[in-house]
């Protein structure tokens, strides 16, 4: 959530920066509500001050026996009127706060001044490439490899649920489990505390991380409860410290969580209908940081490097990309994407987004720390470390052999228990 004071005092700056996302945001109504709320705060403070003075006068007059009952009742009536007026203003403020919350929650984060300017993904800037992309002819797509090796079944999954669900079978399930354990071990050994959060989250948690209200159509909601299937572990990890003041001495807090993720993919009709790339349910290992506001720029580089380390250990070719202002996620100020090489399509596909959200999520979730004896909002960062299904797809395609088998990356062999997945 953006700072009300910034919107109120520097609206042009806010509008100009939001426009870099490629959309016009009118903040006049928000500024009007914010100014009105500030005026009410001033009125309340003034009335409370007058009421306090009056109480002192009444007390002094009673102690000195300088007041009769009629005068005393008149003063008490005046005090009651002050309290009634304060109560009325408090109710107005409550209504204004709700309106402000609703309006401000629709505004995305301000892009970082360091994010490249651009309208869409075509304007993203490649930072670097790593590894040697496989470019042979007649390479199979991962779904063909998976079907040939009996690693998953999408037909039966459609009977169980509907399209865009998949059941991993045999070595497919085994490979998924191996990847999860491998990623969790790598990150845990790198200073992350492992959490296993709930898969169901409430609306307040989704609001806090920035998924609501904008992405309500992209999520699955329970019919009879204020609960949603979590679209990413970023949601419960943000909410883990909701409404807390964190001791600066223990920062940064670094968490890693494996979780199922659920997305409706409402806007992806006709795209990636086969395989593991775009499913309604998928598994992901998520990295999440709570850090000192002065340290988030360095933390962003570090969390990205931590996600990259998985790709390097698995020897999967990838590139890193600096996301332009028009392609940034709602809560992000700056994002570095990691894209893994998929030989069958001769292109890179996103496998991790590592984002610095500054204090945007912390404001929405009321997560603060103490800096120079003052309470300040903390900074949050998140990144996939990695998406399991897409990692599996990359291993199948980059590790495919002429005999139809798949070579397992050396670092994964102790977890998988074999160097190859072979036809039976």
Curated annotation (Swiss-Prot):
Pathway: Aminoacyl-tRNA biosynthesis; selenocysteinyl-tRNA(Sec) biosynthesis; L-seryl-tRNA(Sec) from L-serine and tRNA(Sec): step 1/1. Keywords: Aminoacyl-tRNA synthetase, ATP-binding, Cytoplasm, Ligase, Nucleotide-binding, Protein biosynthesis. CDD domains: SerRS_core. PROSITE patterns: AA_TRNA_LIGASE_II. GO terms for biological process: selenocysteine biosynthetic process; seryl-tRNA aminoacylation. GO terms for cellular component: cytoplasm. It is found in: Cytoplasm. It is an enzyme of class 6 (ligase). L-serine binds at residues 232-234, 286, 384. InterPro entries: aa-tRNA-synt_IIb, aa-tRNA-synth_II, aa-tRNA-synth_II/BPL/LPL, Ser-tRNA-ligase_type_1, Ser-tRNA-synth_1_N, SerRS_1_N_sf, SerRS_core, tRNA-bd_arm. Homodimer. The tRNA molecule binds across the dimer. Consists of two distinct domains, a catalytic core and a N-terminal extension that is involved in tRNA binding. Catalyzes the attachment of serine to tRNA(Ser). Is also able to aminoacylate tRNA(Sec) with serine, to form the misacylated tRNA L-seryl-tRNA(Sec), which will be further converted into selenocysteinyl-tRNA(Sec). Belongs to the class-II aminoacyl-tRNA synthetase family. Type-1 seryl-tRNA synthetase subfamily. NCBIfam families: serS. This is Serine--tRNA ligase. It comes from Prochlorococcus marinus subsp. pastoris (strain CCMP1986 / NIES-2087 / MED4).
């Amino acid at each position: 959530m953006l700072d009300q004071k910034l919107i109120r005092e520097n609206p042009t700056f806010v509008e100009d920066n939001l426009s870099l996302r490629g959309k016009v945001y009118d903040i006049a109504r928000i500024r009007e509500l914010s100014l009105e709320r500030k005026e009410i705060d001033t009125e309340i403070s003034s009335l409370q001050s007058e009421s306090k003075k009056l109480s002192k006068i009444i007390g002094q007059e009673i102690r000195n026996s300088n007041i009769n009952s009629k005068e005393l009742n008149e003063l008490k009536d005046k005090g009651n009127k002050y309290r009634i007026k304060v109560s009325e203003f408090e109710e107005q403020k409550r209504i204004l706060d709700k309106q402000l919350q609703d309006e401000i929650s629709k505004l995305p984060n301000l892009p970082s001044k360091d994010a490249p300017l651009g309208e869409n993904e075509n304007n993203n800037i490649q930072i670097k490439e790593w590894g040697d992309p496989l470019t042979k002819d007649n390479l199979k797509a991962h779904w063909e490899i998976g079907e040939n090796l009996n690693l998953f079944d999408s037909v039966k999954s459609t009977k169980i649920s509907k399209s865009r669900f998949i059941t991993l079978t045999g070595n497919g399930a085994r490979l998924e489990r191996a990847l999860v354990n491998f990623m969790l071990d790598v990150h845990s050994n790198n200073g992350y505390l492992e959490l296993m959060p709930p898969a169901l989250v409430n609306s307040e948690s989704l609001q806090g991380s920035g998924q609501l209200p904008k992405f309500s159509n992209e999520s699955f909601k329970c019919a009879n409860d204020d609960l949603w299937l979590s679209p990413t572990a970023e949601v419960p990890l943000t909410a883990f410290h909701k409404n807390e003041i964190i001791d600066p001495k223990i920062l940064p807090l670094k968490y890693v969580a494996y979780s199922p993720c659920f997305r409706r993919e409402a806007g992806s009709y006709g795209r990636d209908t086969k395989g593991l790339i775009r499913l309604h349910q998928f598994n992901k290992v998520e990295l999440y940081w709570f850090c000192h506001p002065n340290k988030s720029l360095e933390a962003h580089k570090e969390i990205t490097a931590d996600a990259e380390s998985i790709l390097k250990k698995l020897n999967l070719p990838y590139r890193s990309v600096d996301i332009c202002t028009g392609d940034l996620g709602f809560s992000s100020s700056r994002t570095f994407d990691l894209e893994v090489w998929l030989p069958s399509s001769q292109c890179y596909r996103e496998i991790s987004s590592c984002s610095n959200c500054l204090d945007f999520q912390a404001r929405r979730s009321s997560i603060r720390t103490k800096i120079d004896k003052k309470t300040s909002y903390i900074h949050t960062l998140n990144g996939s470390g990695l998406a399991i299904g897409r990692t599996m797809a990359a291993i199948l395609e980059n590790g495919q052999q002429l005999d139809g088998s798949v070579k397992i990356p050396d670092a994964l062999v102790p977890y998988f228990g074999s160097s190859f997945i072979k036809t039976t």
